[in-house]
Amino acid sequence: MTIPWRDVFPAMTTQFRRDESLDLDATGRHIERMIASGASGIVMLGSLGENATLAPEEKRRVVAAAIEAAAGRVPVIATVVETGTAAAKQFARDMERLGADGLMLLPAMIYRADPRETMLHYRDVARATQLPIICYNNPLAYHVDITPAMFAELAEVPNLVAIKESSGDVRRLTDLRNAVGDRYVLFAGVDDLALESAVLGADGWIAGIGLAFPEENQRLWDLAVAREIEAALPLYRWFTLLAHLDTHVKFVQYIKLAVQEAGLGAEWVRAPRRVLVHEERRRILKVIHAGLEGRPKLPKARKPRPRAR
C-alpha cells in the first residue's frame, strides 16, 4: 500500500474486557469509527495501546485484527518497542510478514542509550525490514532524546521516513525543518500542541484524545492545515481542555474513560494500570462530560487542503 503520510493517524487503544482479556471485536469497531471519521491511517500497539502489557502473540493478534478491520482502506502501522535491538528486529520482521503497512519504532526500553547507541538501534531495525518507519521521539516518557542533529545523521537510512515529535517543545518542528528540510514527514505527537504544530508545518497528527472525539479531531486538523485559524481557534480552545488529558502519566486511563463515556469502547486496562476511582475519577469525568456537553458546532474548512507531499 502507498501510505498517505499526512493528516490524522489515531493511536488506537487496545480494547480489553473486564477480566483483562483482549476484546478484538471492540477494537475493530473502534477502528471502523475512526476510519469513518476520516483517519488517514491507524497506529497500533503504541503507548495508548498498552504495548508493554501484551505478550508477543497477543501483539500479533491485535495487529492482525486491525489489518482485517482496516480492510485495505487505510494503512496499519504497528509499533515496535522492545528492551533489546534483536527483539525489535524480530518483531519488525514479524509485522512485515503479518501484513502491516508500516512501523513506528521507539528506542530500546529500560537502558538509557546514548546518541550513538540510539542511532545504531534505529539503523539495525530499519535494515531488518522493508517497511517504512515512523521514528517516535518522546524524551519525557522514554528518557532518550533523538535530536535534530541525530535525525540529520539518520537521513541516509531510506526507510526511516517520518518522525512523531512528542518532546513537548513545539520549537522542535522548526529545528527539524532547519536541520533536515523535507527529508522526513513530521507528525505532531502531543494533542495539546496540535494546532501550533500544524501552523509550523507538521504534515500530520498521531492523535490520542481524538479517539473519543473523532469528528472534532479531524475537523480541527482540516482547519489547521487549511490555515483557517480563526475558525479553528474556538474548536481548539474547547478541545484543549480535553487534550490536556493526553499529557498526564495516567493518559491511558483518562483517554479510555473518555472513549467509554463517548460510547466508543470500554475503559478496562491491564494491570499494573487500574481504572480510575474516587475523587480522581470524579474529576476526570467532570472534564470529559463538560467536553461532551459543550461540543461546538463544527465549522467547515473553506480553503482547499494542501496537497500531499
What are these regions (language model features)?
Residues T2-P10, Q15-H143:
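Active-site beta->alpha loop and helix N-cap motifs at the rims of alpha/beta catalytic domains
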Residues T2-P4, Y184, V259:
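Catalytic cores of TIM-barrel enzymes
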Residues L24, G28-I31, P148, R281-I288:
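Short, amphipathic alpha-helical "lid/cap" segments that border enzyme active or binding sites
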Residues S37, R61, A65-A70, D94, ...:
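Alpha-helical structural signal in soluble globular domains
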Residues L54-E57, Q90, P115-T118, I146-P148, ...:
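Short secondary-structure transition/capping segments
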Residues R127, P139-T247:
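Catalytic alpha/beta core domains of metabolic enzymes, predominantly
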Residues L195-R309:
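Structured C-terminal cap/extension of enzyme domains
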